[in-house]
Amino acid sequence: MLTEFKQFIARGNVIDLAVGVIIGAAFTAIVQSLVKNLINPLIGIFVGKIDLSNLVFKAGDATFKYGSFINSVINFLIISFVVFLIVKAVNKITKKEEEEKPDTPTETDYLKEIRDLLKEKETK
């Protein structure tokens, strides 16, 4: 059982996934700090409040914390844009690698070549 677990953990996909989750969590913290400490104050200058997360709308006993929602939307947009840029870069690199690969002959190509050689030999 322990050996199987070691083999499972040692597989590339599991390790890649773990690294991705850890980096994603760290990146999320960076984006949240960016939004809280830089973007919110800039927006707050125009809105009149520095801390957007405290923006609320009250209707009777109900309190709608739309400032926190705005923060979450900004976080989402930044993270989505960065992920988009990363995927775009990876696709560009992958496409270049595919273009650089020489075409390897297929089984059909070899059979056609053999056929052509046999035809040549028969005509001589």
Curated annotation (Swiss-Prot):
Residues making up the signal peptide according to the UniProt record: none
GO MF: mechanosensitive monoatomic ion channel activity
Lipid bilayer topology: Multi-pass membrane protein
Keyword entries, A-Z: Cell membrane, Ion channel, Ion transport, Membrane, Transmembrane, Transmembrane helix, Transport
Record-linked InterPro entries: Mechanosensitive_channel_CS, MS_channel, MSC/AndL, MscL_channel
Transmembrane annotation, as ranges: 14-34, 37-57, 67-87
GO terms for cellular component: plasma membrane
SUPFAM superfamilies: Gated mechanosensitive channel (SSF81330)
Domain of life: Bacteria
UniProt similarity note: Belongs to the MscL family.
HAMAP family: MscL (MF_00115)
Subunit structure: Homopentamer.
Function of the protein: Channel that opens in response to stretch forces in the membrane lipid bilayer. May participate in the regulation of osmotic pressure changes within the cell.
NCBIfam families attached to this UniProt entry: mscL, PRK00567.1-3
Protein name: Large-conductance mechanosensitive channel
Lineage: Bacteria, Bacillati, Bacillota, Bacilli, Lactobacillales
Gene: mscL
